[in-house]
């Protein structure tokens, strides 16, 4: 095997170690009755990287393309003709963060990847095997509906797309064992040669500052669990403020440093109480009221021990935005 290129551009990978101790598996909260907090978190999602690409699985082509015009490109996801970010994409991205920072099971892995026995995917069998890791208790597992759901995110105002050229995306040749993989928020490296060529592809993306309206529905969650979700959305407590700690990445082409987003402008709608009348009467928190509620839940989360300290510190330090370019070529 030829030696690796010592001058190769650093890859934007983050490896978060899987702890040696197994997850804290407990009985999940179920759906027979309402307990804890039930409601919806409304917020904006703003593109923080140069571009965001959420693929539809389809492509378009221009039979008249010449010169540096793209001939074939992968399209952005749409619902009824409108640009959209599927709720499943948001849920998957946030769940992967929750799994990493709470020392939960590894729910998604490919055949041949070696996962420690202690962190194998949770299994739920009523009356036989009911204890689940923190992430599976929140997001669900086969046989048990989750308590957190994301709606499709729709554009705020008019959003223009752009066809951009990126290096081809290949499967990694080697997986790091005993680690979870994420992607850093580095700077997108624009290619000067726009012509179609082997080893590159074109994608339809939305640009920085594009905003989408999001909704996260939660049911029967504890304050600490809701605080955990706020941490996973990139929030961080700073004395009396809630600040951006890191930018989660969603969508495709993450190895090309696309997909970093910021969640903001929270509005919380809570339902609950001891009577049906109390439950049907929603309580809305906006502005400073919503921020104080976020702080309260995040404080409860820190006190609860839900977050695995060393995993969180490693993840947070590696996921902060970096003023470095992504590799331009194939890797």
What do the PLM-derived regions correspond to, one by one?
Residues 1-331:
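RNA-binding basic/glycine-rich loop and surface signature characteristic of RAMP-family CRISPR effectors
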């Amino acid at each position: 095997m030829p030696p690796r290129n010592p001058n190769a551009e650093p890859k934007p990978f983050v490896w978060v170690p899987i702890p040696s101790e197994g997850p804290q598996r407990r009985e999940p909260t179920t759906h027979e009755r309402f307990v804890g907090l039930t409601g919806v978190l409304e917020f904006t999602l703003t593109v923080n990287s140069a571009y965001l690409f959420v693929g539809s699985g389809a492509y378009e082509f221009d039979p008249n393309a010449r010169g540096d015009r793209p001939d074939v490109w992968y399209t952005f996801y749409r619902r009824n003709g409108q640009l959209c970010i599927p709720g499943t994409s948001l849920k998957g991205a946030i769940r992967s963060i929750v799994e990493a920072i709470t020392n939960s099971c590894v729910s998604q892995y490919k055949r041949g990847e070696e996962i420690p026995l202690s962190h194998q995917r949770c299994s739920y069998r009523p009356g036989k095997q009911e204890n689940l890791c923190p992430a599976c208790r929140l997001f669900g597992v086969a046989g048990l509906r989750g308590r957190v759901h994301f709606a499709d995110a729709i554009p705020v105002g008019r959003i223009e797309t752009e066809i951009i050229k990126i290096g081809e995306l290949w499967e990694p040749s080697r997986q790091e064992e005993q680690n979870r993989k994420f992607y850093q928020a580095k700077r997108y490296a624009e290619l000067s040669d726009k012509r179609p060529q082997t080893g590159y592809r074109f994608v339809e993306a939305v640009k920085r500052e594009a905003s989408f309206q999001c909704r996260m529905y939660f049911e029967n969650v504890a304050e600490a669990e809701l605080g955990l979700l706020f941490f996973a959305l990139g929030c961080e407590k700073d004395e009396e403020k809630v600040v951006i700690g890191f930018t989660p990445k969603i969508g495709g082409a993450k190895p090309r440093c696309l997909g970093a987003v910021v969640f903001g402008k929270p509005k919380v709608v809570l339902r609950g109480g001891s009577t049906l009348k109390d439950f049907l009467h929603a309580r809305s928190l906006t502005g400073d009221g919503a921020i104080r509620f976020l702080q309260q839940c995040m404080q409860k989360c820190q006190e609860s021990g839900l977050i695995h300290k060393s995993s969180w510190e490693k993840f947070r330090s590696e996921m902060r935005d970096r003023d470095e370019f992504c590799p331009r070529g194939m890797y």
